[in-house]
Amino acid sequence: SRGAGGLGIKGADDQYFVSKNFTAYNTISNGPLRTLFQLDYADWEGPEGKIKEQKTISLDYGNNLMKIEVSIEGTDKISAGISLQQSMGIIHESNNFLTYKQNHFDTTLSNVIMTTLKHYDGYHIYNPGIKDQNHVFLDFKILNETLTYYVGFYWSKSNQFSGHEAWDQYLNDLAMKIENPITVNIK
């Protein structure tokens, strides 16, 4: 399973090539405002040969999405998946992000994958009906062997947002900020 944000490459005949678990890690910082660490992966086979992958992950206090910066060699396209559970939820794609909302007992969970428009390359659903193999994927273009994307979730009982509309507005605002970052010029 790609869980929420795991990478894979679709090959011929709907065969997926996926990275395995990380083989090494390095904690860069673990402060009160930001946690930052790096994950190294063993080389893995893609549809056209060997893939090299390293991720730098940051999670800022108060944010609902973690930022994942990937250094990747061996492909110019890749996808990040969200595992589809037994009961099909609602998939929504908007500009440069994808959400999957599903009921969970008496609550709702919403997973999200987001990227910049320059990396965005659509989305697709892979649903062979096999447990842990059903996913919705956000597709990416790799630029200069790098990719930046964001992964997170919302749980309706967290009381962090007043409802799904507020969560959706948070995502739309965040997508706009990611696409138009603040720049500071010092003279």
Residue ranges and their predicted role:
Residues 115-187:
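Beta-strand-rich recognition/accessory modules
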Residues 51-53, 64-95:
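Acidic (Asp/Glu-rich), glycine- and aromatic
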Residues 41-45, 59-63, 72-74, 84-86, ...:
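Beta-strand elements of well-folded, non-transmembrane domains
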Residues 43-50, 105-111, 121-125, 157-161:
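Short, surface-exposed beta-strand/loop "edge" segments at domain boundaries and coil↔beta transitions
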Residues 26-33, 61-63, 71-77, 106-107, ...:
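A short, structured loop/turn motif at beta-sheet edges
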Residues 35-39, 53-55, 66-68, 80, ...:
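Hydrophobic residues positioned within well-ordered beta-strands of beta-sheet architectures
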Residues 79-132:
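Polysaccharide-binding surfaces and accessory modules of carbohydrate-active proteins
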Residues 1-61:
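Extended, loop-rich substrate-binding clefts of extracytoplasmic carbohydrate-active enzymes
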